[in-house]
């Protein structure tokens, strides 16, 4: 059985609507595949859905078989009719004029985590380390989601919820576990290889909005490595108006900045449609 829908989300199936799709279909007892132009992916992996590059007016087909296949197809149709939970059609992001601000310049660099490739532990011990670090990072994301909600920043809360789904992808853990088995490396080395490859896949997309998601993957890699390597990371504290200078900045870092003191952020890399830019705009 299958059902095809035409996507009406302005920015296609980016992280937030894709995470809604993953969550909804995960509740049904059925074997499912999503298909676009002959390419199929499992709906369990939000990253594989994103890499399909499902855009506005594209046709997406759900193929399902099993005890609850019919129910899954009905839910899929309802999701599409509801724009996968996006209540408003958002226009494509555009560069906006920035009002003049002043403050002391501070060059920010995230803490670097030292990653060793060779492991002295068993494969099972490294797998346990990786699962624990992922669990800690998922808890971090739940905390950031709650913080954003408490501040009335519902859009940002939805982004961190999407990050949670990005990280909680069984295919990522499976790929890292395979590396651990074959190369007998450390958990941090295996995880770094898997997420760097995923980041590069996003950067190679020709859709600007999806391409900018690489910074979300880099953010998740950094947060997980901090736990794996037990690296201490503290954001600098400012007591006077400051303008942050950086090559790039992680979305989760932006949320932790005090907008009453950090008056502006100037990046030499990044993208106007990155989550960091969205967070900065929301916090102004």
Task: State each model region's role.
Residues 1:
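Mid-to-C-terminal polyanion-binding domains and interfaces
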Residues 30-33, 39-42, 51:
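Nucleotide-binding motor/catalytic cores of P-loop/tubulin-like NTPases across gene-expression machines
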Residues 4, 11, 16-19, 23-26, ...:
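Non-catalytic, soluble scaffold/interaction modules
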Residues 7, 38:
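Generic anion/oxyanion-binding catalytic loop in active/binding sites
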